[in-house]
Amino acid sequence: MGAYNDPYFEVVIGVFMLLFGINFNLYYFLLLRHFREALASEELHVYLGIVAFSTLTITANIAGLYDSVGTALRTAFFQVSSIVTTTGYATVDFNLWPTYSRVVIVILTFVGACAGSTAGGLKVSRVIIFFKAARQDLNKMLHSHAVTTVRFEGKPLDEKTLRGVHNYFNIYIMLLTLSVLLVSLDGFDVVTTFTAVATCLNNVGPGLELVCPMGSFADFSAPVKLLLAFDMLAGRLELYPCLLYTSPSPR
């Protein structure tokens, strides 16, 4: 994408990447002229907030690397849009950015965009529910007799839903950890190993160091490439189908 070197091109593609990271149900509401319901989406607000915060803070962090703040803002916006929507495009090698910006990019790799969109990752809705459930558990520890309810999009969530989110996170972390351990046998540095697994499991594309936008996965061994391919399938199918397929059948 960087070969075009066209600000208009970058902004238009960046905006449309963000649009495809929005829950498609909201577009259905817009078609029905239910504008209030669409714009009141909690997940949409958090999603756009994450994009805005990441773009602005990365811009401030990398401003000294570019000839103007406008160029830094445009560059940060495109990379943030690409990573959070797991599109995988890049106009610069963000592996050369300062540490803060690189860390934000890795976090966005995990978060992903909205549920019901074209994006991979954990999904903003799951992240919201996970943190709300964690806050509820903390409140119960501090106030044992308090009765609290986790609400999402204005509706209370039952224990089955909360348990499903917790189980998904647990399985995700277990698969991530196991994959990192196995990929580390190839002997590459920690950042390369971790981000290679993260970018495959979340279907993003580029990571950091050896698998940065200007790098590739070519140097990994054949068994590791097969493992990363499995991670890509598992992440795209949201873990359960691939894990169930590889599980032994009950007798």
Model-derived features: positions:
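Membrane-proximal intracellular helices of multi-pass ion channels
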Residues: 1-247
